[in-house]
Swiss-Prot record:
Species per Swiss-Prot/TrEMBL record: Synechococcus elongatus (strain ATCC 33912 / PCC 7942 / FACHB-805)
An example Gene Ontology CC term for this record: cytosolic large ribosomal subunit
Protein's UniProt name: Large ribosomal subunit protein uL6
This protein's UniProt keywords: Ribonucleoprotein, Ribosomal protein, RNA-binding, rRNA-binding
Family: Belongs to the universal ribosomal protein uL6 family.
Length: 179
């Protein structure tokens, strides 16, 4: 049995869960999320916990068991406390700012790069070089952070670019000159 899938998901006090077949809707202090789970899994609510189990023992159901449990757990955590991803901008003259809701990145291109946030996502810029992407959906927060990083990924020679906080960038030695 899936070790992740068999763990129950505790429901926090301020969160309400509605299960309608394969559709799971979660409402909490930060907002509301819903997701349709893949076939082959059954979701039930028992005394303050959500339990994800398999409909049968097929290979597909076994594959989707742990995935479905994690997806539901992310819904519950998102509406209760939310998610955030931090990015660092490294490079001389590289900086970020927020204008209204739009993130504006000056990262060495001739024009600044403007990034509009998807619905439910907020950008916060700390001291011009740190960007915090926050929201209630882990998937959307991660995808938005990846889009920002893709504007100028860290390069291996000087390490300039946009990276996740704590990301280790492998550095390369430059060419050695001929003597």
């Amino acid at each position: 049995m899936s070790r992740i899938g068999k763990r129950p998901i505790p429901i926090p006090a301020k969160v309400s869960v509605a299960i309608d077949g394969r559709l799971v809707s979660v409402k909490g202090p930060k907002g509301e999320l819903s997701r349709e789970l893949p076939s082959g899994v059954v979701v039930t609510q028992e005394d303050g916990n959500i339990i994800v189990s398999r409909a049968d023992e097929s290979r597909l159901a076994r594959q989707r068991h742990g995935l479905s449990r994690t997806l539901v757990a992310n819904l519950v955590e998102g509406v209760d406390s939310g998610f955030q991803k931090r990015l660092e901008i490294i490079g001389v003259g590289y900086r970020a700012q927020v204008q209204g809701t739009t993130l504006i990145l000056n990262v060495g291109y001739s024009n600044p790069v403007q990034i509009e946030p998807p619905e439910g996502i907020q950008f916060v810029v700390e001291n011009n070089t740190n960007v915090v992407v926050s929201g209630i959906s882990k998937e959307v927060v991660g995808n938005t952070a990846a889009r920002i990083r893709a504007v100028r990924p860290p390069e291996p020679y000087k390490g300039k670019g946009i990276r996740y906080a704590g990301e280790v960038v492998l550095r390369k030695a430059g060419k050695t000159g001929k003597k």
